[in-house]
C-alpha cells in the first residue's frame, strides 16, 4: 500500500513538472502578439481630466501643496520662477485653464437649471 502511494506521488510529480515545462514554451509569434496587445492597451488609455484629478485629490494632497506654496514663498520665488522650476509652458497652462473653465461653466449651467426647476416646483405648488 505504501509503495503504491509513493509510486502515485512520484507519477504526479513527473506529470506536473512536464506540463509546467510545456506551459513555459512559447514561440515568437505569441510573444509578438502579446507585445502588440500591450502596446494597443497603452494607446487606448485616456489621459485623466482635471475634474478627475480634482475629485481624487484629498485634503492631505491639498495640505502638501500648501506646504510647497509656503516653501516657495519663503524662498522668495516669483510665480514665473516657479513656472520655470516646474517646467510648465504657457500653452500647457492655457490648456489647463480652458479645462477648468469648461468644468466651472458646466457646473454653473447645471446649478442654474436645478435652481430654475426648484423655483418652478415652488411656483406650481403654491396656489
Curated annotation (Swiss-Prot):
GO CC terms in record: extracellular region; host cell nucleolus
Motif RxLR-dEER, residue numbers: 40-62
Swiss-Prot/TrEMBL keywords: Host nucleus, Secreted, Signal, Virulence
Disulphide-bridged cysteine pairs: none
Phenotype when changing residue 86 to D: Disrupts homooligomerization, prevents association with UBK, impairs nucleolar localization and accumulates in the nucleoplasm with cytoplasmic background
Superkingdom: Eukaryota
Segment forming the signal sequence: 1-20
Keyword Signal: yes
Oligomeric form and interacting partners: Forms an unusual trans-homodimer. Interacts with host UBK.
Family from the record: Belongs to the RxLR effector family.
Cited function: Effector that suppresses flg22-induced post-translational MAP kinase activation in potato and tomato, but not in Arabidopsis. The perception of highly conserved pathogen- or microbe-associated molecular patterns (PAMPs/MAMPs), such as flg22, triggers converging signaling pathways recruiting MAP kinase cascades and inducing transcriptional re-programming, yielding a generic antimicrobial response. Does not suppress programmed cell death triggered by the P.infestans elicitin infestin-1 (INF1), or by co-expression of tomato Cf4 with Cladosporium fulvum Avr4.
Protein name: RxLR effector protein SFI3
